[in-house]
Amino acid sequence: MISVDFSKGLVPTIILDDQNGDVLMLAYMNEESYHKTLETGYTWFFSRSRNELWNKGATSGHTQKVKQIWTDCDNDTLLIRVTQIGPACHTGKKSCFFNLIKEDF
């Protein structure tokens, strides 16, 4: 198995909808949340604001069932394809990326 580089503590983790490839959210994993994700098959992250682990959907029911886990060429960023149940964003939106800044460059 490929080793993920947790030497800086947290690893950016991009979550994609496995059904259509849409970007759902960006969160951070530490080594513990990564291993909990591997063990349970559901996403676990590290909350920088609360300084604790959190299981996506544990409160809301909007869970993320892991389908695939990828790493980038440096092994310090993760991309996880999931089956998303309900919205991914805490605002109730499907994706956390719904604020367009600029288009038509």
UniProtKB/Swiss-Prot annotation:
Record localization: Cytoplasm
Pathway per the UniProt entry: Amino-acid biosynthesis; L-histidine biosynthesis; L-histidine from 5-phospho-alpha-D-ribose 1-diphosphate: step 3/9
Xref: InterPro entries: PRA-CH, PRib_AMP_CycHydrolase_dom, PRib_AMP_CycHydrolase_sf
Cofactor note text: Binds 1 Mg(2+) ion per subunit. Binds 1 zinc ion per subunit.
KW Hydrolase (keyword) present: yes
Superkingdom of the organism of origin: Bacteria
Pfam annotation, one family: PRA-CH
Segment forming the signal sequence: none
GO BP of this protein: L-histidine biosynthetic process
Residues that hold Mg(2+) according to the record: 72, 74, 76
Binding site for Zn(2+): 73, 89, 96
Entry's Gene Ontology cellular component terms: cytoplasm
EC number, UniProt record: 3.5.4.19
Keyword Cell cycle: no
Cofactor(s) needed: Mg(2+); Zn(2+)
Class of the enzyme per the UniProt entry, highest EC level: hydrolase
The family this protein is said to belong to: Belongs to the PRA-CH family.
Record's function text: Catalyzes the hydrolysis of the adenine ring of phosphoribosyl-AMP.
Oligomeric and partner information: Homodimer.
HAMAP family reported for this sequence: HisI
Descriptive protein name: Phosphoribosyl-AMP cyclohydrolase
